[in-house]
């Protein structure tokens, strides 16, 4: 397998390869507050708006739904793609939304009016992922099954750069917070960092076994990259040092689908105290898992529907109805996870036939006495 420029073999640095998978008692409970129905096929992407007032969900049913994040009311539906929607992204001021779809295109939408403002074409296969730069919001990155990364000027609709990024479908494309770098992941098992201005590859990261990488994103401070791989693991990479810092496993199942992750309890949600910063990821068993970002321990779970019905999962899910929430959970794989920008809330999207969007409230719990 060709590695490309800036290669770094991660086999040399695996000090954290084996870590305990769970604490004796979870310290974070997830209570489902809203179960949002309306999509007729799998929900591939969920994203809170930058101010947290809206939640966008993109589905294989070709539509994007906009929900009031506080009430769960559906406030708009964006329709126009001729195939399923794989990803959604908000620009930094929350006025505009981008969508990536299997019809080989991206669309830009006015989130207030629901009008389609522009269609971006050029990819020659499914467009799987998209993200705005977090600075000015003028750049949009997209990744495709055509194995390329594209950078777009959303003001003109012009493709600024086409990068032959990988040798298999690109599963994620995300900017660093200042927009200077883009990280991509692929089913070819590689994570690559790119210079936004030049399009040059700055670093290629890979494991010895190179499992397919289904998701990658920078941490909020852009010092690390979080990724999900199709061997049931999530990993935190120190890309400058060329090594993994932490591996998260044992709390979620992920061998088939591209599942996203997020950060909870850190700088992006500093208005509450959950006791630790966490990596939150979906699972193919229909649950939601939270890991302590520093130790790798499983610190909480949002129960799948079957587990909740049997009294399993965390106490917050099992007691949701009594606490004013929604009993149960997803009945199929959780494909998408997104964390609210300022509140202890996590949104999730379910695979077919679940097809639902759920919002979970996270709260700290006291471990039971031994």
Swiss-Prot record:
<feature type="repeat" description="WD 4">
    <location>
        <begin position="165"/>
        <end position="204"/>
    </location>
</feature>
<feature type="repeat" description="WD 5">
    <location>
        <begin position="208"/>
        <end position="247"/>
    </location>
</feature>
<feature type="repeat" description="WD 1">
    <location>
        <begin position="38"/>
        <end position="77"/>
    </location>
</feature>
<protein>
    <recommendedName>
        <fullName>Protein Mut11</fullName>
    </recommendedName>
</protein>
<dbReference type="Pfam" id="PF25175">
    <property type="entry name" value="Beta-prop_WDR5"/>
</dbReference>
<feature type="region of interest" description="Disordered">
    <location>
        <begin position="1"/>
        <end position="22"/>
    </location>
</feature>
<feature type="repeat" description="WD 6">
    <location>
        <begin position="262"/>
        <end position="301"/>
    </location>
</feature>
<dbReference type="Pfam" id="PF00400">
    <property type="entry name" value="WD40"/>
</dbReference>
<dbReference type="InterPro" id="IPR036322">
    <property type="entry name" value="WD40_repeat_dom_sf"/>
</dbReference>
<feature type="repeat" description="WD 2">
    <location>
        <begin position="80"/>
        <end position="119"/>
    </location>
</feature>
<dbReference type="InterPro" id="IPR019775">
    <property type="entry name" value="WD40_repeat_CS"/>
</dbReference>
<keyword id="KW-0677">Repeat</keyword>
<dbReference type="GO" id="GO:0005634">
    <property type="term" value="C:nucleus"/>
</dbReference>
<dbReference type="InterPro" id="IPR015943">
    <property type="entry name" value="WD40/YVTN_repeat-like_dom_sf"/>
</dbReference>
<comment type="function">
    <text>Part of a complex involved in 'Lys-4' histone H3 methylation.</text>
</comment>
<keyword id="KW-0853">WD repeat</keyword>
<dbReference type="GO" id="GO:1990234">
    <property type="term" value="C:transferase complex"/>
</dbReference>
<feature type="repeat" description="WD 7">
    <location>
        <begin position="329"/>
        <end position="370"/>
    </location>
</feature>
<dbReference type="InterPro" id="IPR020472">
    <property type="entry name" value="G-protein_beta_WD-40_rep"/>
</dbReference>
<keyword id="KW-0539">Nucleus</keyword>
<feature type="repeat" description="WD 3">
    <location>
        <begin position="122"/>
        <end position="162"/>
    </location>
</feature>
<dbReference type="InterPro" id="IPR001680">
    <property type="entry name" value="WD40_rpt"/>
</dbReference>
<comment type="similarity">
    <text>Belongs to the WD repeat WDR5/wds family.</text>
</comment>
């Amino acid at each position: 397998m060709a590695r490309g420029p800036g290669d770094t073999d991660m086999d040399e640095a695996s000090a954290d390869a084996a870590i305990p998978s769970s604490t004796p008692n979870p310290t974070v409970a997830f209570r489902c507050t809203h179960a949002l129905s309306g999509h007729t096929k799998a929900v591939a992407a969920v994203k809170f708006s930058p101010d947290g007032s809206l939640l966008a969900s993109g589905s294989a049913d070709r539509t994007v739904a906009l929900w009031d994040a506080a009430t769960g009311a559906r406030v708009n539906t964006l329709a126009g793609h001729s195939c399923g929607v794989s990803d959604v992204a908000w620009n930094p001021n929350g006025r505009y939304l981008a969508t990536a779809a299997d019809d080989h295109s991206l669309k830009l939408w006015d989130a207030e009016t629901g009008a389609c403002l522009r269609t971006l074409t050029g990819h020659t296969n499914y467009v799987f992922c998209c993200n705005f730069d977090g600075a000015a919001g003028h750049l949009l990155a997209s990744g495709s099954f055509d194995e390329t990364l594209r950078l777009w000027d959303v003001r003109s609709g012009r493709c600024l750069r086409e990068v032959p990024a990988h040798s298999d479908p690109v599963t994620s494309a995300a900017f660093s917070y200042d927009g200077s770098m883009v990280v991509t992941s692929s089913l070819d098992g590689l994570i690559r960092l790119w210079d936004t201005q030049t399009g040059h590859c700055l670093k290629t990261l890979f494991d010895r076994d190179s499992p397919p990488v289904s998701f990658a994103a920078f941490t909020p401070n852009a010092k690390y990259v979080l990724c999900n791989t199709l061997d049931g693991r999530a990993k935190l990479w120190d890309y400058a040092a060329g090594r993994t810092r932490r591996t998260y496993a044992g709390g979620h199942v992920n061998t088939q689908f591209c599942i996203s992750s997020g950060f909870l309890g850190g700088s992006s949600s500093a208005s509450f105290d959950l006791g630790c910063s966490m990596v939150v990821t979906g699972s193919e068993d229909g649950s939601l898992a939270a890991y302590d970002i520093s130790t790798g321990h499983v610190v909480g779970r949002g129960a799948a529907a079957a587990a909740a019905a049997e009294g399993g999962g965390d106490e917050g899910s099992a007691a949701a109805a009594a606490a004013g929430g929604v009993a149960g959970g997803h009945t199929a794989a959780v494909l998408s996870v997104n964390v609210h920008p300022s509140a202890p809330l996590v949104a999730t999207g379910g695979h077919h036939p679940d097809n639902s969007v759920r919002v979970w409230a996270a709260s700290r719990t006291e471990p039971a006495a031994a």
